[in-house]
Amino acid sequence: METKIEKVLKILEEEIVAAEGCTEPIALSYAAAKARRILGTVPNKVDVFLSGNIIKNVKSVTIPNSEGMIGIEPAIAMGLIAGDDKKELMVISDTTHEQVQEVRDFLDKKLIKTHVYPGDIKLYIRLEISNGENNVLLEIKHTHTNITRILKNDKVLLSQICNDGDFNSSLTDRKVLSVKYIYDLAKTIDIDLIKPIFQKVIRYNSAIADEGLKGKYGVNIGKMILDNIEKGIYGNDVRNKAASYASAGSDARMSGCALPVMTTSGSGNQGMTASLPVIKFAAEKNLSEEELIRGLFVSHLITIHVKTNVGRLSAYCGAICAASGVAAALTFLHGGSFEMVCDAITNILGNLSGVICDGAKASCAMKISSGIYSAFDATMLALNKDVLKSGDGIVGVDIEETIRNVGELAQCGMKGTDETILGIMTK
């Protein structure tokens, strides 16, 4: 029987994984590459059935290594032509210029037909491909690489039982997670158990943030903040530097930068939000590597805990979930008590809950900067023993009730918002 610590380590392994490019289009590339390998050839007929949240998150984001292509059809074509499904979310990392031209030629044939999946599953992908002689059906539910069904010529190759109504059903049981357990474990866990994964987080995510500050990506929110620090318009402080650093990573990723990132809860933007402000804070305050890693442990697990309630994809901005993890980590690294960590999370969730997700795109970087600024405010309030009170809007009687309330808001209250956003984006 697994111990609680073993379950937590397994959760980290599931949720913190490398991915190149925004995870929703990359999930399409992965599904396409897998289906093509089973078919044996590039198909001449492709039908894809997608949930609204997948459509929303693929529509406006640049696909890495595609030489600037954007959207559903290019994401699928990249997987069909250039993908290696064995690399999972790094599926198109080795694409060549010649393969990109093949992708463009394939797209010119207009062989891909996109359909809206009518069910309630938020993350749903089904590919049906054919080469005239053989056909393959491949289905993904709930998480980006969770293949639940594969058919070839109507013969079942894979059928995985999956609870359609529970978006966490394919994952390790999250009941082990609570803010109290995360806080206590962060203080006592053997650092060698978590050092390898978080060293990789530091290395990968710092690299793309550095690139975002050097190049021209998206609306350059990260570079803009840094430039204004240097001009003396913004203060030369850790809050501004942290917002700049994390935003720069998103600027680059949303604009197709081919550098990989370590994701959190299925999202690169969440992975960067949960890590880069903490990395920058630790550097500015000369904290030890162990202190940084324990801080990252807090930020990632709080993010995962909140996202477990909110859901993989919804109308609720995932960067705000990750910003709550940042607030917890900053408070923890300041030496804050458990109560102060709870207060910091309460402050940010009481402030920014309701920020919408209207798809993956350049403006995600701006939402990340907003979340990080709020995380610093939430932290300083908590350290000063100031906190939003129970009954103030969605704030519950304790932190766990507040997190559950946020989940209810995202899953139930914002369902209509999600549908309206998709309608606006596709009209």
Curated annotation (Swiss-Prot):
GO terms of biological process kind: L-cysteine catabolic process to pyruvate
List the Pfam families.
SDH_alpha
Q: InterPro entries recorded for this chain?
A: Ser_deHydtase-like_asu, UPF0597
Q: Which residues cross the membrane?
A: none
Q: Name one GO molecular function term.
A: L-cysteine desulfhydrase activity
PANTHER family, alphabetically?
UPF0597 PROTEIN YHAM
Q: Which family does it belong to?
A: Belongs to the UPF0597 family.
Q: What is this protein identified as?
A: UPF0597 protein FN1147
Q: Which organism is it from?
A: Fusobacterium nucleatum subsp. nucleatum (strain ATCC 25586 / DSM 15643 / BCRC 10681 / CIP 101130 / JCM 8532 / KCTC 2640 / LMG 13131 / VPI 4355)
Taxonomy of the source species: Bacteria, Fusobacteriati, Fusobacteriota, Fusobacteriia, Fusobacteriales
